Every structure is written in C-alpha cells, then in structure tokens.
Amino acid sequence: MAVYNYDVVVLGSGPAGEGAAMNAAKAGRKVAMVDSRRQVGGNCTHLGTIPSKALRHSVRQIMQFNTNPMFRAIGEPRWFSFPDVLKSAEKVISKQVASRTGYYARNRVDLFFGTGSFADEQTVEVVCPNGVVEKLNAKHIIIATGSRPYRPADIDFHHPRVYDSDTILSLSHTPRKLIVYGAGVIGCEYASIFSGLGVLVELVDNRGQLLSFLDSEISQALSYHFSNNNITVRHNEDYERVEGLDNGVILHLKSGKKIKADALLWCNGRTGNTDKLGLENIGIKVNSRGQIEVDEAYRTSVPNIYGAGDVIGWPSLASAAHDQGRSAAGSIVDNGSWRFVNDVPTGIYTIPEISSIGKNEQELTQAKVPYEVGKAFFKSMARAQIAGEPQGMLKILFHRETLEILGVHCFGYQASEIVHIGQAVMNQPGELNNLKYFVNTTFNYPTMAEAYRVAAYDGLNRLF
C-alpha cells in the first residue's frame, strides 16, 4: 500500500471539489483530488448540468429551424432522434474533461481515480480500478461527492423502459410518449427537451404549482408554455406503483388514474453520495437524504473535515457548489476567500429559460415590505424581435420609498444571462443599489439588457 501526505484531500471533482482544490492549491497547499470516475468533472460534467444544457441547446436549434419561416422556405421540417442530439453533448463533455484536467495539471493537484473512503479522521484510502489501495494522509479533507437521483425501492430501475436523470443519457431511441415523474427543476428541464423533439410529455407533479419557489407570475408563464408545447402537467398526484411492460410502462397514481407511455423518467428527489465514504469510521452522520450537515464555515462535526456542494443539500446548484467548495478551502487556508454562499441566482434551463435572484412577490407581501413592480415584455424589445424570441419578460421588484432593488425575475430568451446585471446592482452597498441606475445607464442597442431600462421606467411610472 502506497502512502502519500497532503495538506488537503478533496473527495469529488465536480464544481464543489474543483473550487476547493483550486483555491487550496493557489494558496500554496499540497492538494490531492479523488474521484470514483476515471475522468474529472463529476456528475455535473458527465451526467447532469453539461449534457442536459448541451441537449437543450441542440433542441432549441432544431425548434428554431422547424418554426422559422425563413428556414421553411429552404426545406421541410427536420426531426432528429434523441441519440443523434446526444452526440453534440458528448463532444462538449470531452472538451470539458480536457479543460478541467488541464486545470489540475497546471495547479499541481495530484489526481487519484478510485473509490475513496475514510479510514480515520485524517486518512483516506483509495481503492483503484486495478484493485490497488493507496493511502492518503491529510491535515484537512473536503467532502464534495455530490448527489445522485433518489430511487424508491419499489420501482424497478433495471427495467429497460424506466430511467432516472442519470440513465436517461443512455436512451437509445426517441419515445413517442414520455412520463416525467417529478416537476422539480430537472423534471421541467427534461420535459422541455423531449417536448422540443416532438415527444408527447406527461409531467406528473406532486405539488399544486410548478416550481413553487419561483415568483408566481413566472411559474404561471412556464405552465402556459408547457401546455402550449405538448406537455400535459398533472398536479397534486402521487405514484402508487410503476408497471413495466415489454413495450412501455404504466404509471398507477394514488388518485386512481393510470398513464401509459413508451418510457418513464423519474426525477423526484436526490440523495447525497455518502454511503461509500465510511463516515461511520469518523462519526459523521447523514440525514434521511444522505446529506452532511455543516456550519457556516462548511465544517462538519469533525473539525478538520469539510463539506460542499450537493452533498450538503441546498441550494444544489453547480454555480453555488463551486463557490461553496472555494469557501470551504478558504476556511482552511484563511486567505480571505471564505463567504457563506446564500444569495445566488437561480438558473432553470427550460424552454424558455428562467432565472431569478432575490425576493419574489409572495415573500415581500408576506413580510409586509412596501414594494413596487417594473416590467419589460420581450415582445416589445427590438433584440427579441430580431432573434424571433418574443416570449418572456423581465420583472424588477424594488422598494417604493428607497428604490432599493429587492428581486429580479426573468423568463425567456437569455434569462440566465440577463439576471446577472440585476445581481451586480443588488450587490452594491447602501444607496448604490438603486433602480435609477438602469435609467441613468446607457445600454447597447439593440440588446436584451436594455429591458432593465424599460422595466425601470415602468416601475417608476407606478409611483405616486
């Protein structure tokens, strides 16, 4: 058994692990990275964020070709199979792996591929694919092993027609009809992707509203666009059992309804990847979702062991995970990079996409904050008209007395990019966070960004 000594060992090479390893390495620490896959990037790169967003991009291009009158003059609509579209995602994954492998090499982070588990509070044992065991001693260890889809024991995920958000990438055909169980972020994104490929989608939601954490107006807009694009949403429904057939699947609901489709995609919940870490050897406990509890410094109940990313739960976003990992390492190296990551933008890559930051109307009303609303509808924006993307809006919530921006909510073309302008202003201290910034700033024309000026004027016109 080979033995190595490090200042910091990071378990998991997803966004959280990468952020942690890079920060520690740049602070002069000797760092090792352990990942169970033979390539870096974690589930984000190989199974989650990157492939699903690459799929979405390709599907949007197909949709634009099939609906744009200019392209219709060239030829007939074209339809692509899911495996064909997936090829573009595979190319992006390869490029991401190459880039990230280079990051570790340039920063002299040692990579170990294999299953890592705790022998004690300062020792990680890595079982390599060839069976060799390597022992890593470390002053500090950061757990960033991510999460995986939750799989109820009563559902046969080995059935060839039953998938989760990891295994859906192995789908070898394009179903005519698909059941998506779970209308969270992942479920809504995949519902959009398959709908864009011409698949009839049944989206089963066990709640009464899509993505209820969003501003209600944005949630309602998403519901409208879903119903307008071959996505049937069934609210307040819970599964009773899943019946696998030779040529499809039947979902039995507790309400007595039955839905038959060519395949079922399970998108209801995620579980932290902690079961193989040997946490029982160091006294760290996990909750019912397999997640680790940490304090504001991202420290676990064991002082020299930290956690970051999906494995600690909320907000389970790749962007936040990277910052959490960087902050966890910042707590170790004490270079001023620590911060508690709590106010992050939400990006939801449905078609059209959604992004938001700050408070929504429901929260401000409940808190009795005197706010006002400014809106800009994309159908009136020159850039949206040029791009043929008239659906959507930008919504700014601000304090009617101080003009402080309290929340920004965007639905439509480039929403996940547009939101960062509002985020930058909201992060300014004191009176610099002011709605009038958008009135007094010159925006390029035509751009989607100028929606901020339109929305600001709309909001100011509501004041009296």
Curated annotation (Swiss-Prot):
The reactions it catalyses are: NAD(+) + NADPH = NADH + NADP(+)
Q: Which residues are involved in binding FAD? A: D35, S36, R37, R38, Q39, V40, G41, G42, N43, C44
Q: Give GO BP annotations, semicolon-separated.
A: 2-oxoglutarate metabolic process; NADP metabolic process
What compartments host this protein? Cytoplasm
**Under what name is this protein listed?**
Soluble pyridine nucleotide transhydrogenase
For this protein, what is the EC number? 1.6.1.1
Q: Which cofactor does it need?
A: FAD
The Swiss-Prot or TrEMBL record describes its family as follows: Belongs to the class-I pyridine nucleotide-disulfide oxidoreductase family.
Reported function: Conversion of NADPH, generated by peripheral catabolic pathways, to NADH, which can enter the respiratory chain for energy generation.
- Give Gene Ontology CC terms: cytosol
Quote the InterPro entries the UniProt record gives.
Class-I_Pyr_Nuc-Dis_Oxidored, FAD/NAD-bd_sf, FAD/NAD-binding_dom, FAD/NAD-linked_Rdtase_dimer_sf, Pyr_nuc-diS_OxRdtase, Pyr_nucl-diS_OxRdtase_dimer, STH_gammaproteobact
Keyword Transferase on this protein? no
Which GO molecular function entries does the Swiss-Prot or TrEMBL record give? dihydrolipoyl dehydrogenase (NADH) activity; flavin adenine dinucleotide binding; NAD(P)+ transhydrogenase (Si-specific) activity
Q: How is the cofactor bound?
A: Binds 1 FAD per subunit.
Q: Which NCBIfam families match?
A: PRK05249.1 (NF003585)
